[in-house]
From Swiss-Prot:
Reactions listed under catalytic activity: shikimate + NADP(+) = 3-dehydroshikimate + NADPH + H(+)
Protein name, per record: Shikimate dehydrogenase (NADP(+))
Keyword check for Amino-acid biosynthesis: yes
Pathway as given in its UniProt record: Metabolic intermediate biosynthesis; chorismate biosynthesis; chorismate from D-erythrose 4-phosphate and phosphoenolpyruvate: step 4/7
GO BP terms, alphabetized: amino acid biosynthetic process; aromatic amino acid family biosynthetic process; chorismate biosynthetic process; shikimate metabolic process
PANTHER family cross-referenced by the UniProt entry: BIFUNCTIONAL 3-DEHYDROQUINATE DEHYDRATASE_SHIKIMATE DEHYDROGENASE, CHLOROPLASTIC, SHIKIMATE DEHYDROGENASE
Superkingdom, natural source: Bacteria
Keywords tagged on the record: Amino-acid biosynthesis, Aromatic amino acid biosynthesis, NADP, Oxidoreductase
Annotated catalytic residues: 65
Entry GO CC: cytosol
Length: 273
């Protein structure tokens, strides 16, 4: 039976085995999928052992996505753009292919909820790896502009320069934001700590939708704040998690599983409802 895994540290919380088991059942694919906690100082060794022992493919999560980018023999165009790899595949000729499905997963989930991203004015909060991985796929949807806001502007400016050729991208400090947006995406990890990015209320207009890349058993702090300030819709990152997993599954197996039923089952699993 073909063997797959997700590598991270910590990894105990990962829902990837749950998701991929449902995908395999749905598509009638025979495979196993496990979680492996790689030592922080030996990610490369863990990956090499896994593939030497017959592994076919893997997902990579925090904090190893940049290391995976350096490790592979080949990079997909979207992995090159993202500067990080979250999906590894052993090709038929024994090469390790690196891909990045995060941005595609976000866009798929956004389009399910919003249908259209073209012409939208988007605010992206944060300039770390999570944000970098989604800017290219977002710009491919032709929004009117993306504003990258970060506590330190230098990191945001570097990102904006890298993606400037793909569309209109500008930067702002959190405190300087004084306009409203159609869509606000929280790519900071503040929600994990139950905290809020330090942004003014003015970013929420009469038709603002917010999307937090984080998720949990309850609504995230960021989405609760957005709702209190008049956001017309709030979405968490559970759909992105499942959609990027479906994209990885398609890279490995050549078949794309449906996501909506899996999202519902995962939501039940997380909330206990």
């Amino acid at each position: 039976m073909d063997r797959y895994a997700v590598f991270g540290n910590p990894i105990n919380h990962s829902k990837s085995p749950f998701i991929h088991t449902l995908f395999a059942r749905q598509t009638q694919q025979l495979l196993t999928y496990e979680k492996i906690e790689a030592p922080v100082d030996d990610f490369v060794g863990s990956i090499r052992r896994f593939f030497a022992e017959g592994g076919k493919g893997a997902n990579v999560t925090v904090p190893f996505k940049e290391q995976a980018f350096q490790l592979v023999d080949q990079l997909s165009p979207r992995a090159k753009l993202a500067g990080a790899v979250n999906t590894l595949k052993l090709t038929d000729d024994g090469l390790l292919l690196g891909d990045n499905t995060d941005g595609a997963g976000l866009v798929q989930d956004l389009k399910y909820h919003l249908e259209e991203l073209a012409g939208k004015k988007i605010l992206l909060l944060g300039a770390g790896g999570a944000c970098r991985g989604v800017i290219g796929p977002l710009l491919e949807q032709r929004p009117s502009e993306i504003v990258i806001a970060n506590r330190t502007v230098a990191k945001a400016e570097q990102l904006a320069q890298e993606f400037a050729a793909m569309g209109k991208v500008r930067v702002s400090q959190f405190a300087e934001l004084n306009e409203s947006f159609d869509l606000i995406i929280n790519g900071t990890s503040a929600s994990l700590a139950g905290a809020m990015p330090d942004i003014p209320d003015a970013v929420i207009g009469s038709a603002t939708v917010t999307y937090d890349m984080m998720y949990g058993s309850k609504e995230t702090v960021f989405n609760l704040w957005a709702k209190e300030h008049g956001a017309i819709k709030t979405i968490d990152g559970l759909g992105m998690l499942v959609c990027q997993a479906a994209e990885s599954f398609a890279v490995w197996r050549g078949i794309r599983p449906g996501t909506r039923q899996v999202i519902r089952e995962l939501r039940r699993n997380i909330t206990g409802a």
